[in-house]
Structure formats: C-alpha cells, structure tokens
Amino acid sequence: MAPAVGIDLGTTYSCVGIFRDDRIEIIANDQGNRTTPSFVAFTDTERLIGDAAKNQVAMNPINTVFDAKRLIGRKFNDAEVQADMKHFPFKVVEKSGKPIVQVEFKGEEKQFTPEEISSMVLTKMRETAEAYLGGTVNNAVITVPAYFNDSQRQATKDAGLIAGLNVLRIINEPTAGGIAYGLDKKADGERNVLIFDFGGGTFDVSLLTIEEGIFEVKSTAGDTQLGGEEFDNRLVNHFVNEFKRKNKKDLSTNARALRRLRTACERAKRTLSSAAQTSIEIDSLYEGVDFYTSITRARFEELCQDLFRSTMEPVERVLRDAKIDKSSVHEIVLVGGSTRIPKIQKMVSDFFNGKEPNKSINPDEGVAYGAAVQAAILSGDTSSKSTNEILLLDVAPLSLGIETAGGVMTPLIKRNTTIPTKKSETFSTFSDNQPGVLIQVFEGERARTKDNNLLGKFELTGIPPAPRGVPQIEVTFDVDANGIMNVSALEKGTGKTNKIVITNDKGRLSKEEIERMLAEAEKYKAEDEAETARIGAKNGLESYAYSLKNTLSDSKVDEKLDAADKEKLKSEIDKVVAWLDDNQTATKEEYESQQKELEGVANPIMMKFYGAGGEGGAPGGFPGAGAGGPGGFPGAGAGGAAAHDDGPTVEEVD
C-alpha cells in the first residue's frame, strides 16, 4: 500500500508526519523546519508557499494570504468572518455568499476560494513528504478543530481533493493529540485524559478515555476563533496606541508598517514565554520614525487577561458533558503552540487544583503525530503493534436535527454522540391532506432553528391525502466517521423515499468546481516549475560569466593569453554582465542564448590557452572544465541547459 501521511493543517502553521518502521517521523521542509507557515503569496512573477511566502510578507502584505482556515466553510456574512477581515491586509470579497480572497498575481486580478488557498498549503506539505520519502504521496489524514461544523469539514476535505490527495479521514485535532499522547503511555486500566489544544487560530478541549488502545472521545468543546493570533492582535493594538501617543502618528492605515509590527509582536510573545520581558526595535517603522520599546510578561498577561480566562469555560463544559469530576482526570495534555504561554499552563494547573499538565508531546507536532498514526491504520498498515491495536471512537461536536412545526429544533443526534452513528425517528404531517413535507436539517444547540445552522433541506412529496398526524414519515440521520452526514426520509405508506448528502446547499464546491480547481492547481505548479528553471538559467549564465572573469584575472592565464583575445573576451563578459543587470526578468531561452553567445567567444580563446600548455588550467580550474576550484563552476551553468542540449560540448569534458 502506498504511504499515507498525517497532515495537521493549521491556521498559522502546518505540519506533516509519517508512520513507518514502527515509529512516527515528523518531516522537515526544504528550509529544515518541522512546521511550515500556512501562508501563500502571489507576486508579479511567481507564487510562494510556506516560509518563502511568510518571509516576504512585509514587502507584499496585500497579496500574501494567511488564515484561510478562518474563512474555510464559512459564509461571508458570518460575524467571525467580518471581524477577521478587519485584521486582514489582503482583500476578501463576497461571491454567492462565500468569502473569496482577491489578490494580484502576475499583473492580473485573481480570485481564490479559501479551499484553494488551503489546498496550496496542503500541496506544499505533500511535496515536503514526497521529497523526504522519494516517491509520490496520495493518501492523507487531515485534521480539523473538534469544533468545526459540517460545512467546515466538507470544505477541508475539498481542499484535500484540490491538492490531489485522497483524504482517508478528517479527524479532530485534540483526538489526534490524544493518540500521540496515548501511544507513549501503556498504562493499565482506563484513563481519563483531558486534551487542551490551543493553537494559532483555534481552541479545542476534548475529554478522552483511553483503555487498551481504545480511544473514546467523551465530550468536546471549543472556540474556532480563538488562538495565538488574538494575542498578537492585542499586542499590535497596544503598540499602535503607544506609537500614536509618543509620535502623534497613526500607523494603523499602513499595511507594511502593521505587518512589520505584527511580526515583531509575534516574536515578542514567543520570547515572553521564557523571559520576563523583551524589547522591540523596528527601524523606520512609519514615516521615518524608529520604534524602540519594551514589554513585560505581566503587561502581556494583562492585555490578554480576558482571552486567557475564556479558555476555562470550555474545560468546565467538557467535564460537565462527560459527567466527570475534575478530580477524576488522570492526565492533562497540552497541544498547540499557545499552550507554551506560562500563564495558560498555570491557569490549567490551578483549575485542576495544582495538577501539573503533561508535557511529554511536542505541542507543535502532536496533532500531526496522531494524524500519521491514524493514516497508517486507515491505509491498512498492520506491520506494527501500535497501529494494530488502536480503535478510535470520536464524537459529533454539535447536535443534529430537523425543524418541526413552529420552527422548533428537534435533535435526532445529540452533541457528543459517538460517531459513526445512525438514528431514525418517525414524524407526521401537520395539516390535513398535506401532500408533502419539507425536511430541513440543522446543527446547533439552540431550541429554535433560526438560531442554529441550516445544513440543507429537501422535500418528500406524493404523500396520499390523509388527516393530519396519520402519515408516517421516518427520518434517518447517518453520520460517517468524518463527521459528515447523510439524511433520508421514507413515507411508510407508499414507500416513497428521498435523501440528501449534506453538501451543496451551504456553499460546498461542486464536483465541476473541484475539477476546475485541480486543473488550475496543476497549471500553477507547472508555472512554479518553469519559474524555477528560468532562475536556474539566469544563475547559470551569471556564474559562468563571473567565473570566466575570475579566470581572466588570474596571473597565470593572463600571461599566456593574446592581448586582443583577452580584450575581446573581457568586453563580451562585460556586455553580458550589463545585460544581466538590465534583464532580471528575461525568459529562460534568452539567458540560454546569451550563454551560447558567450561560450562561442570564450571557448576558442580558452582552447588556445589550453593548447599553449596552460598547465591543466588555472588554479581555479577553467570554468566548465570540471568542477572547478574555489569559485569554480559545476558543469556549464547550474541551470544552463545550453551546454546539454546538443550533445556534449568541450567544456563538459573533465
């Protein structure tokens, strides 16, 4: 079976892992980092994903997209989306009720759905795994916050499809964290484990019982809009006000200044987890004014006090729902980067009467770790004891039901029901001779459907005339292991049925759209590769020209070359160097033809030099005549395919 990876698709950072040879490996990206920023940037020439995108964000804030996870599967008018948009330097517009990101790419305006942006991050994670494993990776388990609703889960699954992945399962982040913790611990008996998962953009708490490899989620709660970024926002606002006070200037209108400040705030926040105070120094932050300031841990804690405090409410709720007293919790496991904040660790510990949280798993990697185990299990990898004995029982995060007369929410599947699950109930008509019923499916905890989230609706028609209350309509809810639902209705008298897979009504991408996006993703990938080749050709020409120049300036070569030849070669090199300075954006072919021309002048001259017994070349080795010495030169230009196109040329002979 092909390898299957576990991907933690985070709001701010993502991480990928694989289970093989009986252990989990978290895979580092091309920059050597084990987590990759969930950033995608669009420039005049190329698309950047991950570290490269985040590194250039200050220069290009309006075309660098992040936090797609805060938009995915949501409606444009959601209060959360509207609130988040205030912090986004990039443009979010509305298209058929959904939030769409608008950027400028290669000089034209482009629109991307949150699914497409997330798929680009997933593609990057997939490529990271492929580079490490040396083969293609198609199968993946992707994690989502436990509190994600049906549309957010579907949209995440779609992002995986656009990235060309076969999504084996969508699993909940705290559950994945629980697997990571539980694999280490082979404790006897049933253990109640509270997973406190606090990342860059979301917050979840789940209570699991772990016994003999069975991981059963008892209850879950959380906030899909609370994370480390909220703390960054508080710091940014604090310093914007301080800057205003000190300098009478408002930098909040300048995207670049805000971005530089935010980057400094993120760094300061991290530093304050280990130091009691830190300083911020940003040169020429806004209108030429330098900004030097400092902040203490105590002040930071005060700025975020209400946010920190709000994390305790879901903890209480999870214990209440699971009907477990806090003294019966055996372990508290911290997952997610924000759990490194000392104040949060202290609050969790105080809540559990001084019990210390377990820090055995790396908070950044725990979720990907658990997802990788689940991926191995689902791809049928039974090679290991660890994967053989695990059974994962998750729960539905929100109650699911239908609307009955008077706009009442009648739940069929209660929150925290173990999934997969199937539940049927019989309903009837509301008025005499009613020919059909409208089945409207909702998720949420409120008593009235108008306060809950409509997932979809369908009609069951052709009910024979009968007094109200006589026809029997059986409604069945079937939730699969991904937390995604099918609903069917059957009229028992006639045997008429109708069903709905909860999909399109709430803005899920259609099959056609996904296929179109897949094709586009391929196109972008090809463009990215072409750009890499172009830069390779440019670098090849540049290093060829400079190494020729170095060779010429070597005294041993200098003595043996004819003055006219030397002059001719020198002027040709200078011409190419000048052309390079003016043509940074030329095509691959143009660079290659320049290189051919330069080789046409250089080769005969250098051949003469070798003919004149140039003692096997200058100390630096003649460029192209082998690997070269210091400043020497591999082949005829790293990307200069010119030398390879038409059979071997002289410089390739070692």
UniProtKB/Swiss-Prot annotation:
InterPro entries: ATPase_NBD, Heat_shock_70_CS, HSP70_C_sf, HSP70_peptide-bd_sf, Hsp_70_fam. Residues 614-654 are annotated as: Disordered. The keyword Transport does not apply. Keywords: ATP-binding, Chaperone, Nucleotide-binding, Stress response. PROSITE patterns: HSP70_1 (PS00297), HSP70_2 (PS00329), HSP70_3 (PS01036). SUPFAM superfamilies: Actin-like ATPase domain, Heat shock protein 70kD (HSP70), C-terminal subdomain, Heat shock protein 70kD (HSP70), peptide-binding domain. It holds the Pfam family HSP70. One of its GO terms (molecular function) is ATP binding. Gene3D superfamilies: 1.20.1270.10, 3.30.30.30, 3.30.420.40, Actin, Chain A, domain 4, Substrate Binding Domain Of DNAk, Chain A, domain 1. Residues 614-640 have a biased composition (Gly residues). NCBIfam families: PRK00290.1. Belongs to the heat shock protein 70 family. This is Heat shock 70 kDa protein. It comes from Trichophyton rubrum.
